[in-house]
Structures are given as structure tokens and as C-alpha cells.
């Protein structure tokens, strides 16, 4: 592990986490049963990981620190499986089973779809 790699991951993670926090502040109050900030972070992150993987696949000559900054750091800090899991469990424990299932479908289905779309975007327009 290089010092620059360590720095790239740390800076990227801080920026991603700050964006996730901003999305939570802006969007979670809209509907507490389905916190849109967490959903937005995971869907945007899903799309951007597809774009990033496609981009780095076609730009293999870039220094590895860029991939660490964007994918491991920024997108790792932006997306959040633990918050998503906690929100789903809270819905289920509150008896809101339908909301819990919709939460799962929106996060997983939406993120997978947008990851494919992001990858397709880079492949199509490169």
C-alpha cells in the first residue's frame, strides 16, 4: 500500500461521505418511512460505479491512485449498505413489511440497473 494510495482512498471517502450526509439532510425528511437520501446515495453511486468501471477499463494507463480515489474512496464513502440494512430492519420491526420490501427492491434493483446503465453509457459514448 503506497502513501499516495492511502491518501487517495481517504480523500475520496471523505468526499463521498460528505455527499451522502448532504443527501440525507436534503432528502430524508421527505418521507421518513423510505429515506430518500440513502436511496439517492445508493442509486447515484450505482450509476457512477458503472461509469467508473467502464472508464477505467478503457483508460488502463491511468495511475492506480485514480481508481482508488474514485471507486474505493469516493463511491465507497457515498454508498451505504449498512444504513440501507438498518432502515429495512426498522421498517420490518415497525410492522411496515411492504415498505421494507419496497425499500429492498428500490435499492437493489435500482442500483443494479443504474450500474449497468452507467457501464453502457461509457461503452456507448467512448
UniProtKB/Swiss-Prot annotation:
GO terms for biological process: cellular detoxification of fluoride. The chain crosses the membrane at residues 6-26, 36-56, 69-89, 99-119. Na(+) binds at residues 76, 79. It catalyses: fluoride(in) = fluoride(out). Its main location: membrane. PANTHER family: FLUORIDE EXPORT PROTEIN 1-RELATED. This is Fluoride-specific ion channel FluC. It comes from Ralstonia pickettii (strain 12J).
Amino acid at each position: 500500500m503506497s502513501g499516495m494510495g492511502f491518501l487517495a482512498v481517504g480523500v475520496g471517502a471523505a468526499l463521498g461521505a460528505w455527499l451522502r450526509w448532504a443527501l440525507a439532510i436534503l432528502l430524508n425528511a421527505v418521507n421518513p418511512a423510505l429515506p430518500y437520501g440513502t436511496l439517492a446515495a445508493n442509486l447515484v453511486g450505482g450509476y457512477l460505479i458503472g461509469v467508473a468501471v467502464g472508464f477505467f477499463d478503457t483508460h488502463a494507463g491511468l495511475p492506480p491512485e485514480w481508481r482508488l480515489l474514485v471507486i474505493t474512496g469516493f463511491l465507497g464513502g457515498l454508498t451505504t449498505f449498512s444504513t440501507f440494512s438498518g432502515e429495512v430492519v426498522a421498517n420490518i420491526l415497525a410492522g411496515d413489511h411492504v415498505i421494507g420490501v419496497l425499500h429492498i427492491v428500490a435499492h437493489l434493483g435500482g442500483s443494479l440497473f443504474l450500474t449497468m446503465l452507467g457501464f453502457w453509457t461509457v461503452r456507448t459514448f467512448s
